[in-house]
């Protein structure tokens, strides 16, 4: 079975749709979103799309901050979590409050652990491409899939496959392409997928009020 993973859509419906389309083109039969469906792009358009399509989702640090009213007033103009919280309906708040911090699945005898951050700190720990994975060699899973860093990565070490999907909406790796990942549980082969999102993110920026730093970042993304 081909599983698809993406993360950190951060309220950008247009980029999320681009990521979902890319995964389906690569044959994904089941898709998972690994957290941070809100933040940076204010509103619920991405989260609502995930909910409508019944895509299994995890809770990320942005959902957790929104629910716990932990918005930092100094950072809120960038994260837009205050605005997003004020726009929330009871249905949206119930949905986001019920999201799990981790998810374990097994397919074709492949054990897969999904987290937003890391296996030991599912919400907040960053596992960058240069972070040692040795502390996670004893995790009870064959494949660990993460997000949070906005930097895509795939490594096969310690007898396991570690995948970071990167972000489908606000990539921070060189090149400025959105990213996601697929895993063929029949063969054990994992693959990163990259796709241009410049037009999509700028379209979203045109209809929303974004922080200058976010506007400047997406201005550098290549045309799509």
Protein language model features and the residues they cover:
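Short acidic-hydrophobic surface loop/beta-edge motif
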Residues: 101-109, 155-157
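Core catalytic region of metal-dependent phosphoesterases/phosphodiesterases
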Residues: 2-97
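Acidic, His/Gly-rich catalytic cores of divalent-metal-dependent hydrolytic chemistry
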Residues: 156-224
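Active-site-proximal beta-strand elements of phosphoester/diester hydrolases
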Residues: 2-10, 111-118, 162-166
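Anionic-ligand binding region
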Residues: 126-155, 160-163, 178
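Active-site environment of divalent metal-dependent phosphoester hydrolases
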Residues: 10-15, 39-42, 62-67, 120-122, ...
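Active-site-proximal segments of metal-dependent phosphoesterases and phosphodiesterases across multiple
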Residues: 74-79, 107-139, 171
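Structural motif
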Residues: 30, 56, 112-113, 142-144, ...
């Amino acid at each position: 079975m081909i599983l698809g993973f993406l993360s950190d859509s951060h309220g950008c419906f247009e980029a999320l749709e681009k990521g979902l389309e890319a995964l389906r083109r690569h044959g994904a039969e089941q898709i998972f979103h690994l957290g941070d469906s809100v933040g940076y792009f204010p509103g619920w358009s991405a989260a609502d799309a995930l909910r409508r399509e019944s895509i299994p989702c995890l809770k990320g640090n942005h959902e957790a901050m929104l629910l716990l009213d932990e918005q930092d007033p100094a950072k809120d103009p960038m994260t837009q979590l205050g605005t997003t919280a004020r726009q929330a309906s009871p249905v949206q708040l119930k949905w986001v409050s019920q999201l799990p911090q981790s998810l374990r699945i097994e397919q074709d005898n492949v054990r897969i652990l999904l987290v937003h951050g890391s296996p030991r700190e599912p919400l907040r720990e960053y596992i960058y491409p240069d972070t040692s994975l040795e502390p996670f060699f004893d995790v009870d899973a064959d494949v660990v899939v993460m997000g949070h860093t906005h930097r895509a990565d795939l490594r096969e070490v310690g007898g396991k496959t570690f995948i970071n999907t990167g972000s489908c909406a606000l990539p921070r790796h060189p090149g400025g392409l959105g990213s996601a990942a697929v895993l063929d549980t029949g063969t054990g082969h994992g693959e990163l997928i990259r796709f241009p999102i410049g037009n999509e993110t700028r379209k979203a920026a045109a209809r929303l009020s974004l922080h200058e730093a976010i506007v400047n970042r997406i201005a550098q993304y290549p045309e799509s």
